[in-house]
Swiss-Prot record:
It comes from Corynebacterium aurimucosum (strain ATCC 700975 / DSM 44827 / CIP 107346 / CN-1). The keyword Magnesium applies. Keywords: Glycosyltransferase, Magnesium, Metal-binding, Transferase. 1D-myo-inositol 3-phosphate binds at residues 9, 20-25, 78, 110, 134, 154. It is an enzyme of class 2 (transferase). One of its GO terms (biological process) is mycothiol biosynthetic process. Pfam families: Glyco_trans_4_4, Glycos_transf_1. Belongs to the glycosyltransferase group 1 family. MshA subfamily. This is D-inositol 3-phosphate glycosyltransferase. One of its GO terms (molecular function) is acetylglucosaminyltransferase activity. Mg(2+) binds at residues 303-304, 306, 330. Catalyzes the transfer of a N-acetyl-glucosamine moiety to 1D-myo-inositol 3-phosphate to produce 1D-myo-inositol 2-acetamido-2-deoxy-glucopyranoside 3-phosphate in the mycothiol biosynthesis pathway. Its EC number is 2.4.1.250.
Length: 421
């Protein structure tokens, strides 16, 4: 079995936490790796952003990343990438033709890639499996007042994919409900595949490992630590955590607390200075420490150094950071949105907050910061909870989905395109 995965707007080899790289990158790379270890041949097609990348990167046996030149290497935002859909699709088609590669299934990730996959499906007469990761209609429902709404053009493209993909893969049952409610999707075409965490990499630390992690990060040993890991964009809610920190320090100015925010700017209107300035304005610049994005091997130290990991997002299809933190033995305080109520067992492995107010977040953080036995017990339960989610299990499910897709009778391409949105 040979799979053409498409991740146009971001390479799975890019550093998560900066630019457009995030949970989707982690998902694509880890599922592809596990599929390759099951014997599935996987080529991941992405848009080249540097000439030094090379056309073909051999990641491991049976897994390659193919960098397709489509437009300039630099200077295009994600919002401008639709102008390069034709060039990118043509690049994939020419690669497969020149190297005489035949694929059995296309698996596209995100709506931009889905548009490419939709056309290639008709050209190659093979099934299309699509994973949206985020949906315009859902993001618009949950966006903040000063967030730019997703465009109607994107929503139309997503509707086309819902109507025309052979199988839709989602992370949670909540995503299934979202597709049905906002896009009138058929439940028969939707399959839930829960993401996982690398439980070999993300493991609970001993007291000695926690001390070492804190020394590496320059954090005092007897200080409580709350960590945030993710892109610095409004949708991820780093400002919520900073405001909650100010509320905590106002309640108890002598509180020994450090808040570590690890991530980089994302989006045209995003800048780390926004959050640095906010911390300064609220008087917590000495409490909040900003770190640049870290590779997974270094994120382990941040999770192990933290007493709590905060995930104050306005929406998450699943919440990989929450799962990685729990695998590391750290309880999570998360917003009760999207897939986070599935990723976090409320009251057992962390707490869910049903608003984004600084007061409510300070209340939740305070509960765990001031209750060592409860927090430690939650951390222990978090490890067991995370063990239920694995990339190996997700890949096994995907392999079965691909096999099912290959058995679908593919209608005539002209008839199929005639029913486009």
């Amino acid at each position: 079995m040979r799979i053409a995965m498409i991740s146009m707007h971001t390479s799975p080899l890019e550093q998560p936490g900066s630019g457009d790289a995030g949970g989707m990158n982690v998902y694509v790379l880890n599922t592809a790796r596990q599929l390759a270890r099951l014997g599935v041949e996987v080529d991941i097609f992405t848009r080249a952003t540097r000439p030094s990348q090379g056309e073909v990167v051999d990641v491991e046996e049976r897994l390659r990343v193919i960098n397709i030149v489509a437009g300039p290497y630099e200077g295009l935002s994600k919002e401008e990438l639709p102008t390069q859909l034709a060039a990118f699709t043509g690049g994939i088609f020419n690669f497969a033709r020149c190297f005489e590669v035949d694929y059995d299934v296309i698996h596209s990730h995100y709506w931009l890639s889905g548009q490419v996959g939709w056309l290639l499906r008709d050209l190659w007469d093979i099934p299309l499996v699509h994973t949206a990761h985020t949906l315009a209609a859902v993001k618009n429902v949950h966006r903040t007042l000063d967030d730019t709404p997703e465009t109607e053009a994107r929503r139309i493209c997503e509707q086309q994919l819902v109507d025309n993909a052979d199988i839709l893969v989602v992370n949670t049952a909540q995503e299934t409900r979202d597709l049905i409610e906002h896009y009138d999707a058929s439940p028969d075409n939707i399959v839930v595949v829960s993401p996982g965490a690398d439980t070999d990499l993300y493991t609970p630390g001993t007291d000695r490992m926690t001390e070492r992690a804190r020394r590496q990060l320059g954090i005092p040993l007897h200080t409580k630590v709350v960590a945030f890991v993710g892109r610095l964009q409004k949708f991820k809610g780093p400002d919520v955590l900073i405001r909650a920190t100010a509320e905590l320090m106002e309640r108890d100015p002598d509180r020994r607390l450090r808040v570590v925010i690890c991530g980089g700017a994302s989006g045209a209107n995003s800048s780390p200075d926004t959050y640095h300035n906010l911390a300064r304005e609220l008087g917590v610049e000495r409490v909040v420490r900003f770190l640049s994005p870290r590779p997974p091997q270094e994120l382990v130290a941040i999770y192990q150094a933290a007493d709590i990991v905060a995930v104050p997002s306005y929406n998450e299809s699943f919440g990989l950071v929450a799962m990685e933190a729990q695998a590391s033995g750290t309880p999570v305080v998360a917003a009760a949105v999207g897939g986070l109520p599935i990723a976090v067992a409320d009251g057992d492995t962390g707490l869910l907050v049903h608003s984004h107010s600084a007061q409510d977040w300070a209340d939740a953080l305070e509960q765990l910061l001031d209750d060592d036995p409860r927090r430690i017990s939650m951390g222990e339960a978090a490890v067991d909870h995370a063990q239920q989610f694995s990339w190996a299990a997700a890949a096994t499910q995907l392999e079965n989905i691909y096999a099912d897709a290959m058995s679908i009778e593919i209608p005539d391409c002209h008839a199929r395109r005639a029913i486009g949105y």
